[in-house]
Amino acid sequence: MTGRTVTVVGAGLAGAEAAWQAARRGIKVKLYEMRPEKLTPAHRSGYFAELVCSNSLRAAALENAVGLLKEEMRHLDSLVMACADVTSVPAGGALAVDRDLFARCVTERIAGNPLIEICREEVTAIPEGEAVIIATGPLTSDALASDISRFTGENCLFFYDAVAPIVAAESINMGKVFRSSRYGKGEAAYLNCPLSREEYEVFWEALVKAEKAPRKEFEKELHFEGCMPVEVLAARGKETLLYGPMKPVGLIDPRTGRRPYAVVQLRQENAAATLFNMVGFQTGLKWDEQKRVFRLIPGLEEAEFVRFGVMHRNTFINSPVLLHPTFQTRKNPALFFAGQITGVEGYVESAASGLMAGINAARLLAGKEPLVFPRNTAHGSLAHYITAADPAHFQPMNINFGLFPPFEARIRDKKERYRTVAKKALESIDRFKETLL
């Protein structure tokens, strides 16, 4: 055990996991949590790792990327996964928990660790320290957010998600789309889904009648200037989208030699070209409605949505500019960020990022080199996405197999292919774990 201390700010899923991982390696931890003295608009208790939305940690099977991420966490002795497994409730093919028992489990184990000192107070500025992990989540307090903005620069801290859906490339019907940029300028960077007048009118009718996701009370005053939901634009008139995200100007369908009546553009989301973003289609529709309505677009009839559109309050940094894949900041290697504030999306992803940051902060204080997790693992792919994505278009993301390196072996059956990816990932995690001892 060293006499050095990791300071962790925020005891949500990421902060609790980070503190646990550092303490497991013999490092003292000061864990700051402002609740219950000061509650966020979403939290209701002072328990650590409180689940404020769903009680589901999503799919359990290894052929699902989040199922693999959870299994990797188990191999790495995750506190969050240990508590989730002992407080689970029946949920079919998913892992769901009794949220009160889960939060109590995490809190009690943290409180029972002699190396972790709990400080129930608000942190209003980035602390000085030998190693500091900021894990304050999407509802970071105003005072601390202001100081983070000072550190990152005002253009590198965002306060809401306005995200368009992302689809898996292999699910796009390439026979119905064409690759082109407007007016043929530059490289043909976009996939274009052309719509006839009749197809557009069917799509528009479905869009304006689709059911919107309810806003939480603390999100009702959000305004998304310059980033209007596509359904709000559509409601302004039948032709509004034709002058906005579905404008066809400068595009010629090579199969007809004519300009389509309307076009939906898909922009490549990652270097491997496995993911495509629906340009300008940020939306607040319910997820089932997004699937139903957007599959009316030619070429997207069988689209697999790896990320649905969302519009909600979410404080996060521009990680591709600010972070190394070790979760250290580029400006200060003793300062780490973890959790949703880094641009990972979801309970499990937040905890996994805390696990990586906690391990690396402990290594830093032990005089060891912080480590980048293997690229072919769910942990490594998540870290790679948030630090290597295009900074100009960076948006929070759930783990999905589109973030992994392209799989070289040709396996037609998708489930079998993903099971093979998972097997290799777990083998890599087990080898990697030996370097952490």
From Swiss-Prot:
Record-stated family: Belongs to the MnmG family. TrmFO subfamily.
What keywords does the record list, in alphabetical order? Cytoplasm, FAD, Flavoprotein, Methyltransferase, NAD, NADP, Transferase, tRNA processing
Q: Which InterPro entries match?
A: FAD/NAD-bd_sf, MnmG-rel, MnmG-rel_CS, MnmG_N, TrmFO
Q: Does the keyword Zinc-finger apply?
A: no
What reaction gets catalysed by this protein? uridine(54) in tRNA + (6R)-5,10-methylene-5,6,7,8-tetrahydrofolate + NADH + H(+) = 5-methyluridine(54) in tRNA + (6S)-5,6,7,8-tetrahydrofolate + NAD(+); uridine(54) in tRNA + (6R)-5,10-methylene-5,6,7,8-tetrahydrofolate + NADPH + H(+) = 5-methyluridine(54) in tRNA + (6S)-5,6,7,8-tetrahydrofolate + NADP(+)
Q: Which residues bind FAD?
A: 10-15
Question: Which top class of enzyme applies to this chain?
Answer: transferase
Its protein name is Methylenetetrahydrofolate--tRNA-(uracil-5-)-methyltransferase TrmFO
Where is it chiefly localized?
Answer: cytoplasm
A single GO cellular-component term from the record reads: cytosol
A Pfam family matched in the record: GIDA
Q: List cystine links.
A: none
Q: Which domain of life is it from?
A: Bacteria
* Location of this chain's protein in the cell: Cytoplasm
Report the record's Gene Ontology biological process terms. tRNA methylation; tRNA wobble uridine modification
Catalytic activity, EC: 2.1.1.74
MF GO annotations: flavin adenine dinucleotide binding; tRNA (uracil(54)-C5)-methyltransferase activity, 5,10-methylenetetrahydrofolate-dependent
Recorded hits in PROSITE patterns, A to Z, give:
GIDA_2 (PS01281)
The protein's job, in short, is:
Catalyzes the folate-dependent formation of 5-methyl-uridine at position 54 (M-5-U54) in all tRNAs.
Cofactor(s) needed, names only, are: FAD
